[in-house]
Amino acid sequence: MGEPQRPLAVSLGDPAGIGPEIIVHAWRMRDSANLAPFAVAGGANVLRSATEALGVPCPIQEIDDIAEANSAFLEALPVIKGLDGAYLPGAPDPIGAKLALKSLEMATRLATAGHASGVVTAPIAKGLLEQVGFTHPGQTEFLAAACGLPEDASVMMLAGPSLRAVPLTVHCPLAEVPGLLSIGLIVERGRIVASALQRDFGIERPRLAVTGLNPHAGEDGKFGNEEQDVIAPAIAELLADGITATGPHPADALFSPHSRAGFDAALCMYHDQALIPVKALDFDQGVNVTLGLPIVRTSPDHGTAFDIAGRGTAHPGAMVFALLMAGECAARRADA
């Protein structure tokens, strides 16, 4: 019999947001959702307070070592000692942001050191993190840097039960997208996506569908030349590499049930082109997966939701799916 899988490390997220409560709910769903064991990087007091506010049973067990999580997980939510703070739902401040950052750093260290099988990150508020010294555009770029990679070496994929989609450009003004797209960018990220679908998702021959940038995928240059000058040559290069890739597809027709059956992931030209269909189809189960890292990382595809924090109305589905996906990806890597 092989060794048990190492636990996942879960960051607390901003303690004023919905992170603590969706973590509590996820632990309570551990059996029905068949979740792998996980431990939270600090915040025992925050999680106890969240449990009390929710009025649900969730015993908290503080542990010294994440290895203890496997045995503790069945009976209690394991929380690693060393970090804590106050639970003030809906009242974000720099103190809470600093706790969120320290928790993210701890969870990441556990994964990069090989003690955790992967990282699942709860939502943060980037503006507040910047006030306490966070210098990265987001958690994705932070994790790449923590793994010793350039910030642009990782790829963000949004995934749910119905669709996987990758925005090739992310947090930038829409007006800048045409200038940011290049054959090299599309090819490099297409290779990362294809490799990750094989390694982490068990898809032997991944099929990539590549969108156009312009309406009707440019309609032979009538509405723009990016499809002819950039996107089609990139697809040809991916095909030459042995990667199954089709397109450029008009984005408005790509996400129907019939079309989705023909590909494993969509490469989209900009943020909303990828995120709108994922959130429309799988809003309560959408997961942000970071591809191209030596560690597994997932996150629920939603924000801190300060406006509903502490009310008991936050849906835990995306956190549950993020934990489930991280556990499955980690298991595939362990078996490889």
Swiss-Prot record:
Its UniProt entry gives the catalysed reaction(s) as: 4-(phosphooxy)-L-threonine + NAD(+) = 3-amino-2-oxopropyl phosphate + CO2 + NADH
What is the protein name stated in its UniProt record? 4-hydroxythreonine-4-phosphate dehydrogenase
On subunit structure and binding partners, the annotation says:
Homodimer.
Recite the UniProt keywords alphabetically: Cobalt, Cytoplasm, Magnesium, Metal-binding, NAD, NADP, Oxidoreductase, Pyridoxine biosynthesis, Zinc
On cofactor binding, the record's note says:
Binds 1 divalent metal cation per subunit. Can use ions such as Zn(2+), Mg(2+) or Co(2+).
- EC numbers: 1.1.1.262
The entry marks the following residues as binding a divalent metal cation, namely H171, H216, H271
What is any one GO biological process for this UniProt entry? pyridoxal phosphate biosynthetic process
Enzyme class, top EC level, equals oxidoreductase
Assigned GO CC terms: cytoplasm
Q: In which pathway does it act?
A: Cofactor biosynthesis; pyridoxine 5'-phosphate biosynthesis; pyridoxine 5'-phosphate from D-erythrose 4-phosphate: step 4/5
Give one Pfam family, short name only: PdxA
